[in-house]
């Protein structure tokens, strides 16, 4: 047996087998074998960490069995490498010091110096920078004296890394280039790949983006060619950071996720933690504050445990930014103070300046503009000295925006103009769009409408360009959430124009900021559920399915009556179950987000889908009017679109007052939620109370627009924020309910409505009718049985037949999908709003997965199925979104808990008219009017609303 074969077998063996191998091959068990195992450990470190640690373990055992000094020294060296891989930096330093001492004792000064290459990494990661540089320079002299070009280059590379960590970029570049020259002489692809990654990062920090990208591409090609997996991950991580820096969020998420997966697969804890820190930074850029905060909370203790102070400080500082985004002022202050102390202990003035910049953001979010200016100005000098343009530009924008808010127009313009110029020169669109928005506000404040409009339009163009490539609807919606100001201001400018009627243009800007992520899905620009591209993603999908099964069990436990006789025990049991549910839902969301990091979505044109007013008017025809609500400064206004034109009705009332009135109405409706029969004798009085609130809402929301819509037109309502919960069809004018005079339907936006209208109607030949009764809905079975004969063909799934698998199987053939089962709206986690099937729950994400391209109508005859959370940009998050995304053009859903018996009667009447040829809106209106005669309280007849066509 050759030594190489013995080494390979020792690495793969367990300890007992290793002892046997060493004893049976004693002639080969010498210092040469120890050096061979040490070399394997060093070589495998960057490509196969498991093999490297295997070599270290074999050497450790070998040293116990052999008293040779060189064997022990090699074992200590390899133990240091294994500790580095495990993230145990202080232990790595101890082992490498031991190795150096043993080699020096053997009078092997050159080999002793070579051990310091690895020691520099450990010293730097625990913040012992001066010691590391002194150690490195000392070792460099010895290595140069012995002509060891490779080890000397590694030392220079690591010294460069130390200067980089201290944000001293010129010194870092000097050592990187010196090391690169040595590696080029040796034509060492492995070292060149690692070195070019570092050099590229320095170039990106200096805003030499083209040079950085060329170096990254070159480094990644080398690393892939030689199979250096760790180096590949490091380069992909760096490329992700560059993309994030440039606002190319799709590439950033994709590269960062690739790196995280590689580190996780190789079991490298400190690299995995750094990778998660970088993904959290990407989330923060996309306004996913809660998600970013969770990552920061997870990795900060890891960095503390590993004594990685620089990374811990960065995590704390960015966690502070997330807290600002979440409105947690005190928490942000505490986190930033802690980060500042760590940076001070590191002697990192630039890190302290970053914290000061974040403090300026905290003051700005609190409206303390004088403090904003002071903090931003304090941060500028060290940021400028380091050439950190992105953060410097953010500090300057904050100073300019604070000056604008304080009314210092001249100072604000000077700062903002200069900042915009530099942001464009440095390719920083994130800062540029902020500057354009601020300059637009400044121009508007000064009465210069033309300049304001130009600035706002440029800001909108940049926002939509940045948003276009994002790979998932959640990322697009969250990114948009704090960028609505220029859209609102363009609406304001259009409406203020006294020379030209720009109502249609104003509506166009409202639409560009409304339900855009849903529009992207309907327009085919987003895949909601991409296919797995590798085994890793396939395993993630398996985890999702396992979590789904666990959740179904917990949901069933929560929804069944408690077996505990003691109320306190029952409450504790319920709290424990709900905690289990929250943990699993959270994990599902995290895995789903991880799957969506991929950068393979079709590119979305920055030219967003614009509302074609003329086409909308043509589709509405003579008998329909679209009423779209929005608000400016908390005051509601409405756009009315008919075939005759576009009108704007302003000063309808304050959003706050409408929300208060709506809350009172919900209280009245909920009075009957838990049993109408026992309240029957009070129904006339309760009806009168409900009417009072319905009339008040009518007076605010519809009375002022009646003259613009005429007496005969049916209404399509596009609500705004809380108005999504208003039953417009049940509003009362003092004589009649609105539904008594006209048909009413709803849409998330005018563009979404146009997508629904673009579907050619199909005959309703085949219905899929699903009925899963429970204690709250005992009439469901009767409801479904009564509906089946109304259709030429019907697939009926009752009781235990009503499974999610069966719905998925039969839905693609259905013209109508009717789901009669218990529904649950989850305001705490709206994506987990669900319908209870026989064996599990159909959530929003399950609805996404259904194939409803043939389906004309989805009807959900259950409680609160039409409720949605309304995210910024009027993004509806609930069951409606799921079914729209799956392809349904029309949805029949409820706004509140429904009465089982009343629902059964209404559905039968509705479908009789629908199957006889009536439109869905007409059929629903007549069914509601008929039920109104028998059950006058709106609780019974008005919960159902029609979304879409």
Predicted stretch roles:
Residues 3, 34-47, 73-88, 111-128, ...:
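Tandem amphipathic alpha-helical repeat scaffolds
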Residues 449-736, 761-768, 789:
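Amphipathic alpha-helical protein-protein interaction segments
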Residues 62-64, 83, 103-104, 143-144, ...:
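Eukaryotic all-alpha helical interaction scaffolds
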Residues 748-753, 758-760, 765, 773-778, ...:
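Catalytic cores of nucleophile-dependent amide-cleaving enzymes
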Residues 27-28, 64-68, 85, 104-110, ...:
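Short coil/turn linkers that connect adjacent helices within long alpha-helical scaffolds
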Residues 897, 902-949:
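An often Trp-containing, charged/polar helix-loop segment at the C-terminal end
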Residues 41, 644-647, 655-668, 718-816:
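Catalytic-core domains of enzymes
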């Amino acid at each position: 047996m050759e030594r190489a074969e013995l080494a390979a077998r020792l690495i793969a063996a367990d300890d007992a087998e290793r002892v046997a191998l060493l004893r049976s091959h004693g002639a080969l068990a010498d210092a040469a074998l120890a050096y061979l195992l040490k070399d394997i450990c060093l070589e495998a470190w960057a490509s196969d960490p498991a093999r490297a640690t295997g070599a270290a373990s074999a050497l450790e055992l070998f040293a116990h069995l052999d008293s040779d000094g060189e064997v022990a020294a090699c074992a200590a060296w390899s133990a240091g490498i294994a500790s580095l891989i495990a993230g145990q930096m202080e232990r790595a330093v101890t082992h490498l010091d031991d190795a150096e001492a043993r080699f020096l004792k053997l009078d092997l000064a050159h080999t002793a110096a070579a051990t310091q290459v690895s020691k520099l990494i450990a010293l730097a990661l625990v913040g012992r920078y001066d010691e590391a540089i002194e150690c490195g320079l000392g070792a460099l002299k010895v290595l140069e004296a012995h002509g060891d070009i490779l080890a000397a280059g590694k030392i220079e590379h690591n010294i460069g890394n130390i200067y980089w960590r201290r944000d001293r970029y010129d010194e870092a570049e000097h050592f990187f280039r010196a090391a690169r020259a040595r590696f080029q002489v040796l034509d060492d692809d492995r070292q060149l790949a690692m070195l070019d990654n570092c050099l590229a990062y320095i170039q990106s920090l200096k805003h030499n983006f083209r040079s950085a990208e060329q170096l990254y591409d070159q480094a990644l090609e080398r690393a892939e060619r030689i199979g250096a997996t760790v180096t590949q991950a490091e380069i992909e991580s760096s490329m992700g950071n560059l993309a994030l820096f440039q606002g190319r969020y799709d590439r950033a998420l994709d590269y960062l996720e690739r790196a995280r997966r590689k580190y996780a697969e190789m079991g490298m804890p400190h690299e995995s933690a750094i990778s998660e820190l970088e993904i959290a930074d990407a989330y923060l850029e996309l306004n996913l504050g809660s998600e970013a905060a969770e990552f920061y909370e997870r990795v900060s203790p890891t960095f503390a445990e590993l004594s990685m102070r620089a990374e811990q400080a960065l995590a704390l500082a960015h966690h502070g930014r997330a807290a600002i985004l979440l409105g947690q002022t005190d928490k942000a202050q505490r986190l930033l103070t802690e980060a500042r102390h760590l940076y001070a202990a590191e002697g990192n003035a630039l890190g302290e300046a970053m914290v000061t910049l974040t403090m300026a953001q905290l003051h700005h979010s609190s409206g303390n503009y004088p403090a904003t200016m002071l903090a931003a100005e304090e941060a500028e000098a060290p940021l400028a000295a380091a050439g950190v343009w992105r953060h410097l530009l953010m500090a300057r924008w904050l100073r300019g925006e604070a000056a604008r808010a304080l009314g210092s127009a001249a100072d604000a313009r000077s700062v903002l103009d200069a900042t915009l110029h530099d942001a464009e020169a440095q390719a920083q669109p994130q800062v540029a769009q902020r500057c354009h928005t601020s300059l637009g506000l400044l121009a508007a404040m000064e009465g210069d409408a033309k300049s304001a409009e130009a600035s706002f339009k440029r800001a909108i163009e940049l926002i939509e360009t940045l948003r276009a490539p994002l790979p998932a609807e959640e990322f697009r919606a969250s990114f948009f959430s704090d960028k609505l100001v220029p859209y609102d201001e363009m609406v304001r400018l259009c409406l203020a124009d006294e020379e030209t009627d720009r109502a249609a243009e104003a509506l166009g800007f409202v639409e560009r900021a409304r339900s855009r992520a849903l529009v992207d899905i309907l327009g085919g620009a987003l895949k909601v559920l991409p296919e797995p591209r590798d085994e890793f993603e396939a395993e993630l999908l398996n985890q999702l399915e396992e979590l789904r099964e666990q959740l179904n069990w917990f949901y069933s436990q929560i929804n069944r009556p408690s077996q505990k006789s003691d109320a306190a025990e029952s409450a504790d049991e319920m709290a424990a179950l709900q905690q289990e549910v929250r943990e699993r839902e959270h994990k599902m969301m995290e895995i789903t987000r991880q799957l969506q990091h991929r950068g393979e979505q079709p590119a979305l044109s920055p030219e967003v889908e614009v509302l074609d007013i003329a086409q909308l008017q043509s589709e509405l025809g003579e008998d329909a009017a679209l009423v779209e609500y929005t608000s400016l400064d908390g005051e509601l206004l409405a756009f009315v679109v008919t075939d005759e034109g576009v009108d704007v009705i302003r000063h309808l009332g304050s959003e706050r007052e409408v929300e208060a009135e709506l809350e009172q109405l919900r209280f009245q409706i909920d009075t009957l939620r838990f049993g109408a029969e026992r309240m029957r004798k009070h129904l006339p009085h309760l009806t009168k109370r409900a009417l009072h609130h319905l009339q008040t809402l009518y007076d605010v929301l519809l009375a002022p627009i009646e003259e613009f819509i005429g007496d005969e037109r049916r209404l399509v309502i596009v609500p705004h924020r809380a108005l999504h919960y208003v039953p417009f069809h049940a509003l009362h004018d003092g004589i009649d309910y609105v539904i008594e005079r006209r048909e009413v339907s709803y849409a998330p936006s005018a563009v979404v409505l146009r997508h629904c209208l673009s579907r050619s109607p199909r005959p309703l030949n085949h219905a899929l009718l699903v009925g899963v009764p429970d204690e709250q809905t005992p009439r469901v079975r009767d409801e479904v049985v009564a509906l089946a004969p109304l259709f030429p063909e019907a697939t009926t799934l009752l009781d235990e037949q009503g499974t999610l698998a069966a719905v998925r199987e039969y839905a693609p053939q259905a013209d109508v999908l009717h789901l009669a089962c218990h529904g649950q709206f989850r305001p705490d986690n709206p994506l987990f709003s669900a319908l209870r099937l026989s064996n599990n729950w159909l959530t929003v994400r399950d609805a996404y997965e259904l194939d409803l391209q043939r389906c004309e109508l989805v009807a959900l005859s259950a409680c609160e199925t039409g409720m949605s959370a309304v995210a910024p940009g009027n993004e509806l998050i609930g069951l409606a979104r799921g079914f729209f995304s799956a392809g349904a053009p029309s949805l029949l859903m409820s706004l509140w808990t429904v009465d089982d018996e009343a629902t059964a009667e209404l559905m039968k009447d509705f479908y009789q008219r629908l199957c006889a040829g009536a439109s869905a809106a007409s059929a629903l209106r007549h069914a509601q009017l008929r039920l109104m005669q028998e059950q006058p309280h709106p609780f019974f007849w008005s919960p159902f609303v029609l979304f879409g066509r």
